[in-house]
């Protein structure tokens, strides 16, 4: 019989744009997604602001970053910046 308790779920990763890096070791990331309207079928943009842990303060405003979900670090922060995909100009 297989023991499924040792297998971990794949970590959730999302991509977003840094809109604020004014806090120490924390960045605010805007994550945009498209949803389909139930009745009319038009695709609508929706966005969410998330706080992510940036231990080395490497991110700047406008950077596109890849984040992964982690155990809660603070009241509002449960994401960690994994890599900077694209730098802002």
UniProtKB/Swiss-Prot annotation:
List, in alphabetical order, the Gene Ontology terms for molecular function in this entry: rRNA binding; structural constituent of ribosome
InterPro entries xrefs: NA-bd_OB-fold, Ribosomal_uS17, Ribosomal_uS17_bact/chlr
Q: Output the superkingdom of the source species.
A: Bacteria
Q: Name one GO biological process term.
A: translation
What do the Gene Ontology cellular component annotations say? cytosolic small ribosomal subunit
Gene3D superfamilies reported in the protein's UniProt record: Nucleic acid-binding proteins
Q: Which UniProt keywords apply?
A: Ribonucleoprotein, Ribosomal protein, RNA-binding, rRNA-binding
**Pfam families the UniProt entry points to:** Ribosomal_S17
Q: HAMAP family this protein is in? A: Ribosomal_uS17_B (MF_01345_B)
Could you describe the subunit structure of this protein? Part of the 30S ribosomal subunit.
Q: What does this protein do?
A: One of the primary rRNA binding proteins, it binds specifically to the 5'-end of 16S ribosomal RNA.
Q: Which family does it belong to?
A: Belongs to the universal ribosomal protein uS17 family.
**This chain belongs to which protein, by name?**
Small ribosomal subunit protein uS17
Q: Which organism is it from?
A: Xylella fastidiosa (strain 9a5c)
């Amino acid at each position: 019989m297989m023991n499924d308790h040792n297998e971990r779920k794949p970590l959730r990763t999302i991509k977003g744009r840094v809109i604020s890096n004014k806090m120490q070791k924390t960045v605010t990331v805007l994550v945009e997604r498209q949803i389909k309207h139930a009745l009319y079928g038009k695709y609508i943009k929706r966005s969410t602001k998330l706080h992510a842990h940036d231990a080395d303060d490497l991110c700047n405003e406008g950077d596109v970053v890849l984040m992964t979900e982690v155990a809660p670090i603070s009241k509002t922060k449960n994401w960690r910046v994994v890599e900077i995909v694209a730098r802002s100009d």
